[in-house]
């Protein structure tokens, strides 16, 4: 028989840097999960993606065991990395902070494809372009 799910926890944690301190500790401690076990497993699984923020969905079962699924990094994080900026513009419609080539947008869209609700890479590109626009990043051909 399948184990009964008692809690779903969604977190965004820097790759390879999960530790028992907040936000990880309190979120998992309430569910009675072995926090160090999760941290070690998460860090091992995301060691190759250092520097990126990784969304993770943790499913906690009745017997306090857990499974987790790592998602692709948020489009905003990938855009900031490609553009080489620290943060987006406070006034995206007035001041633009960077420009990104369309082929880089395609790369990001292809990376995000498994997690996006898009039928094609072109649709995913439009989503990523919208994120870029809201951050004050100009897309050029």
From Swiss-Prot:
<comment type="subunit">
    <text>Part of the ribosomal stalk of the 50S ribosomal subunit. Interacts with L10 and the large rRNA to form the base of the stalk. L10 forms an elongated spine to which L12 dimers bind in a sequential fashion forming a multimeric L10(L12)X complex.</text>
</comment>
<dbReference type="InterPro" id="IPR036796">
    <property type="entry name" value="Ribosomal_uL11_N_sf"/>
</dbReference>
<dbReference type="GO" id="GO:0070180">
    <property type="term" value="F:large ribosomal subunit rRNA binding"/>
</dbReference>
<dbReference type="Pfam" id="PF03946">
    <property type="entry name" value="Ribosomal_L11_N"/>
</dbReference>
<comment type="similarity">
    <text>Belongs to the universal ribosomal protein uL11 family.</text>
</comment>
<keyword id="KW-0687">Ribonucleoprotein</keyword>
<dbReference type="GO" id="GO:0022625">
    <property type="term" value="C:cytosolic large ribosomal subunit"/>
</dbReference>
<dbReference type="InterPro" id="IPR006519">
    <property type="entry name" value="Ribosomal_uL11_bac-typ"/>
</dbReference>
<dbReference type="GO" id="GO:0003735">
    <property type="term" value="F:structural constituent of ribosome"/>
</dbReference>
<dbReference type="InterPro" id="IPR020785">
    <property type="entry name" value="Ribosomal_uL11_CS"/>
</dbReference>
<dbReference type="InterPro" id="IPR020783">
    <property type="entry name" value="Ribosomal_uL11_C"/>
</dbReference>
<dbReference type="InterPro" id="IPR036769">
    <property type="entry name" value="Ribosomal_uL11_C_sf"/>
</dbReference>
<comment type="function">
    <text>Forms part of the ribosomal stalk which helps the ribosome interact with GTP-bound translation factors.</text>
</comment>
<dbReference type="GO" id="GO:0006412">
    <property type="term" value="P:translation"/>
</dbReference>
<dbReference type="Pfam" id="PF00298">
    <property type="entry name" value="Ribosomal_L11"/>
</dbReference>
<dbReference type="InterPro" id="IPR020784">
    <property type="entry name" value="Ribosomal_uL11_N"/>
</dbReference>
<keyword id="KW-0689">Ribosomal protein</keyword>
<protein>
    <recommendedName>
        <fullName>Large ribosomal subunit protein uL11</fullName>
    </recommendedName>
</protein>
<keyword id="KW-0699">rRNA-binding</keyword>
<keyword id="KW-0488">Methylation</keyword>
<dbReference type="InterPro" id="IPR000911">
    <property type="entry name" value="Ribosomal_uL11"/>
</dbReference>
<keyword id="KW-0694">RNA-binding</keyword>
């Amino acid at each position: 028989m399948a184990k009964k799910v008692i809690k779903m926890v969604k977190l965004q944690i820097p790759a390879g840097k999960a530790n028992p301190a907040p936000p990880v500790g309190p979120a998992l401690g309430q569910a009675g999960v072995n926090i160090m076990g999760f941290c070690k497993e998460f860090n091992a699984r995301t060691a190759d993606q250092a520097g990126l923020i990784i969304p993770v969905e943790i499913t906690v079962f009745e017997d306090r065991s857990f499974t987790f699924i790592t998602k692709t990094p948020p489009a905003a994080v990938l855009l900031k990395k490609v553009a080489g900026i620290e943060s987006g513009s406070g006034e995206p419609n007035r001041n633009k902070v960077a420009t990104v080539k369309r082929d880089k947008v395609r790369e990001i869209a292809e990376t995000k494809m498994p997690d996006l609700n898009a039928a094609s890479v072109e649709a995913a590109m439009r989503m990523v372009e919208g994120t870029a626009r809201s951050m004050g990043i100009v897309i050029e051909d």
